Amino acid sequence: IWGPYDGWAKDGTGDTGFTMAHSMTPSLANPYLFIYKGAELPRKNSIKDKDGNAHPGGLNFKVGPQSAGCYTFGSTADAIRGSYDGCLDIAESDYNQKQTVVGGQSHNRYAFFSVPVGVNYIELDIKELTVFFDKR
């Protein structure tokens, strides 16, 4: 999990924005499914979209603990590298509902999910290209 949601924290395992406390674990039953189950995710910083609107708790998913050139699973929000970030707002009413992710190394690296207060469970399916957020 990467992004400003945790205040761009760093614990020495990779680039700014990565911490082992918020890393995802591959499922033993399905190698395409990654799970985060732990403490409630913080919402320290926001993503600003092309209109200047702030979206707290912005995050996306990267393969590996580096941000530059890393394969990323981002939201479907409009984003252009070097111009503006995009953010898809997730509400509590969206808990346990699948959202589409976009995989690649292009503009999707700057497309985030803004998660609500209380999220402590995430399932990312990199085969089906879906993610869902929950509070458990």
Write out the residue ranges for each language-model feature.
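Aromatic-rich carbohydrate-binding modules that target alpha-glucans
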Residues: 1-56, 66-92
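Exposed beta-strand face motif in extracellular beta-rich ectodomains
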Residues: 57-59, 120
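Extracellular recognition modules
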Residues: 62-64
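Structured interaction patches on ligand/partner-binding surfaces of diverse proteins
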Residues: 70-130
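Eukaryotic intrinsically disordered, low-complexity regions enriched in proline/serine/threonine/glycine
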Residues: 131-136
